[in-house]
Amino acid sequence: MLGDSLTQGYGLEEKKGLVPKLQNWLSTNNVEVLLINGGVSGDTTLGGSERLDWLLTPSINGVVVALGGNDLLRGFDPKFTKNNLQEIFKTLKLKGINSLLVGTISPLNYGPQFKKEHDAIYPSLASEYNLFYVDSLFSPLIDKKTQEISVNLLQADGIHPNEKGVE
């Protein structure tokens, strides 16, 4: 899994992060997959693009790409984010590696035009590169009544899922 602090498991014991929990779920459900935690706290789409070749050992036959949250936090132009993600998927396509793209959803604080441009990146890339696609790691944390992320599922920083949120 190529990602940032959400993938890495920021603020959690190593075995309680997303990758180990997902690995456990897959194993319990008899899915023969070995997940590798390629999450780096603070990573951006550019950082992910720059370290991709280093992560692609011959045994890798699929990659989950969960990047873009730090691009958002830093207010990077959506075109910059999209270009970096395109480089990642061009490389994966050339190597014949299947991919799952996990999107990010922009808040409104950068304005409606920024949100529109940013939120269009992920479905567009999923279509362009024929990727498996999940709209956000946060989707399961959204309260159906309020349509907001349940704060009891987040760490004190309000950004990273706590142990219950990872579950």
Regions found by a protein language model. Give the residues of each.
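A short linear-motif detector with a strong N-terminal bias
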Residues: K15-K16, D43-T44, P112-Q113, S139
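Alpha-helical cap/lid subdomain in secreted, periplasmic
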Residues: V31, S49-E167
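Active-site environment of divalent metal-dependent phosphoester hydrolases
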Residues: G9, L46, L141
